[in-house]
Amino acid sequence: MGRSPCCEKAHTNRGAWTKEEDERLVAYIRAHGEGCWRSLPKAAGLLRCGKSCRLRWINYLRPDLKRGNFTADEDDLIVKLHSLLGNKWSLIAARLPGRTDNEIKNYWNTHVRRKLLGRGIDPVTHRPIAADAVTVTTVSFQPSPSAAAAAAAEAEATAAKAPRCPDLNLDLCISPPCQQQEEEEVDLKPSAAVVKREVLLGGRGHGHGHGGALCFGCSLGVQKGAPGCSCSSSNGHRCLGLRGGMLDFRGLKMK
């Protein structure tokens, strides 16, 4: 539950205070004191809220209020207190007897602030504006000497390092490791082209000195060494153009 309002707004007056209301408020406070501001309006016969009565008394009707302009000493004191306390006007007013916080705030915004700006002083920091501008323009964005020295040392160390593989040529073609093994196996086995060539050459007539020509029966393997064979004098029998000794595996020993 929030705090209840100090008055019923439907039955209170608003706006400027009249002379009669000021006289009633002053007469009641002189007779009974300030007391409780919530119950004071009803006791004094005023159709005002307690907050309105309090502000009217403190800011306008107090007998110890100072009237007139601020003096030079008060101006200096306000500037010094503002540099220490900032915009805490109630604390500043407590050190200026007879002056209210609202009065001091209005005087600061209308007179003192402009006076400080005219003197070249920042009203927030209370420092010379020219000095602040110089400090801003002299900001250097160059790297610190330690950082520059570290970067130079790192560059020298990188340049001093020798390459690990100076003779490495990345353009070389790398053959698969099984190529050499395949070449060896091909050398051990007779080529199919060689066998085919042997067959073709065996059926041709080059004379008896080169193996001789085979007859039709020997070339088909039907007759071997028959009396009518004209190629019986050749070394070994031929079948399909191959000598018989080439296909004879009886002399080989089984491992």
UniProtKB/Swiss-Prot annotation:
Keywords: DNA-binding, Nucleus, Repeat, Repressor, Transcription, Transcription regulation. The keyword Repeat applies. Pfam families: Myb_DNA-binding. It is found in: Nucleus. Residues 37-61, 89-112 bind DNA. InterPro entries: Homeodomain-like_sf (IPR009057), Myb_dom (IPR017930), Myb_TF_plants (IPR015495), SANT/Myb (IPR001005). GO terms for cellular component: nucleus. Its main location: nucleus. SUPFAM superfamilies: Homeodomain-like (SSF46689). Transcription factor that negatively regulates genes involved in anthocyanin biosynthesis. Residues 9-61, 62-116 form the HTH myb-type domain. This is Myb-related protein Zm38. GO terms for biological process: regulation of DNA-templated transcription. One of its GO terms (molecular function) is cis-regulatory region sequence-specific DNA binding.
